[in-house]
Design a protein with these regions (language model features):
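Eukaryotic N-terminal targeting leaders
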Residues: 1-19, 29-32, 54, 154-166, ...
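Glycine-rich cofactor phosphate-binding loops and adjacent beta1-alpha1 units
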Residues: 161-169, 217-295
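Short, flexible surface segments
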Residues: 31, 83-86, 139, 169, ...
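Mid-domain Rossmann-like dinucleotide-binding core that forms the NAD(H)/NADP(H) cofactor-binding site
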Residues: 131-223
Length: 358
């Protein structure tokens, strides 16, 4: 596969700054890396938060974007052909380096990634659909199923591992914000693990989507908290041993905590330090989701998930998020991030095609 000398990327030019598309030299893979031609990349709320809130990144200009799908354009010299070859269809995840305060982002036409953190995708899954998967499956699965002793996790048995499928039959499970990207994947993994009933909150127009993914009950997210608590506990027969708050905003955190049983676990996706301290006093656990494959504590569980993903996707056991494709290639990202920031996206993942960048 021929690779151009120049590569267009969307740069965040400075902290709290503006985005701009520029051309730079196309990167080359090291011995244990692959070069991916990015055919589709998905937008995440974290992307606008890095820009607006100044999170994580201190070295600019920086390329953001955490989810991509594409074709392998080059492979490093040390990669066995049995693993990956040029032309393979794959998904990859961007990341930030907490020590260096830098990013490796997917808002680009070509990206170099370590081959150990890449998964193949079946021909039945489009690049656009596949781009919704990496961070969604990681952030939903790791805080539930990571067995590493130091991991912030509920430490359930993963449903893609031996003994995990259907293991938790008859146990209720609660997902707040089920129509979010992560919420959709949490529902699916809970279904595979056997949890029932699976109760979620969402806007009523997303109910049929979430029921198709495995939710048994969809409660209107706009109901008052006391009514939601009453409805959820009535269905479940009490509080929940496991609650996943897929947005973790001030409106949902108290709700999720109130519905978590003593001895139970609440998973959050944004820092909730005060709640974590309160949980220690109340005999509950609050786990902060960390959904990067490249983080060492996630390596073991991440490897098993990446290995299992092709068959999970092929069988339909895991379905990607519904997508909305934004026009203009990388130039469409900024408008999409504004919509995410204004909470004007529901039930779909925004995706762009970097190769269409003018």
């Amino acid at each position: 596969m021929s690779v151009p000398a120049q590569n267009k990327s969307l740069f965040l030019e400075s902290k709290f700054g503006q985005f701009a598309v520029r051309s730079t030299e196309t990167p080359k893979p090291g011995p244990d890396e692959i070069l991916v031609k990015v055919e589709a990349t998905a937008l995440n709320p974290l992307d606008w938060k890095v820009q607006s809130w100044g999170l994580f990144v201190e070295k600019y200009p920086a390329v953001l974007g955490f989810d991509a799908a594409g074709t392998i354009a080059q492979v490093g010299a040390d990669i066995p052909p049995s693993s990956f070859v040029v032309g393979d269809r794959v998904i990859a995840q961007g990341w930030y380096d907490a020590t260096k305060q830098t990013t490796v982002g997917m808002f680009t036409q070509y990206v170099v990634v370590p081959y150990k953190f890449v998964a193949k995708i079946p021909a039945s899954v489009s690049f656009e659909d596949a781009a919704t998967i990496p961070s969604g499956v990681a952030t939903s699965a790791f805080p539930l199923y990571n067995q590493n002793a130091t991991a912030p996790s509920v430490k359930l048995t993963a449903p893609w591992l031996e003994g995990g499928r259907g293991k938790y039959a008859g146990k209720p499970f609660l997902v707040l914000a089920g129509a979010s990207s992560m919420g959709q994947f949490v529902i699916q993994f809970a279904r595979l693990a056997g949890f029932s009933p699976i109760i979620t909150t969402a806007s009523p127009h997303n109910a049929s989507l979430l029921q198709a993914l495995g939710a048994t009950h969809v409660l209107d997210r706009n109901l008052p908290s006391d009514q939601l608590i009453a409805e959820a506990t009535k269905i479940a027969g009490g509080q929940f041993e496991v609650v996943y708050d897929a947005v973790s905003v001030p409106e949902t955190l108290p709700l999720g905590y109130a519905l978590t049983a003593q001895g139970g676990s609440l998973v959050v996706v944004l820092p909730a330090d005060e709640l974590m301290e309160k949980a220690k006093e109340d005999g509950k656990s609050v786990h902060m989701a960390h959904g990067l494959f490249i983080t060492p504590v996630n390596h073991d569980i991440g490897r098993t998930l990446l290995d299992a993903l092709p068959s999970l996707l092929e069988s339909g056991d895991i379905k990607p998020n519904p997508v909305e494709i934004l026009p203009g290639g990388l130039n469409g990202v900024v408008g999409g991030l504004e919509r995410l920031k204004d909470n004007k996206v529901s039930g779909v993942k925004l995706v762009v095609r970097p190769q269409e960048t003018a």
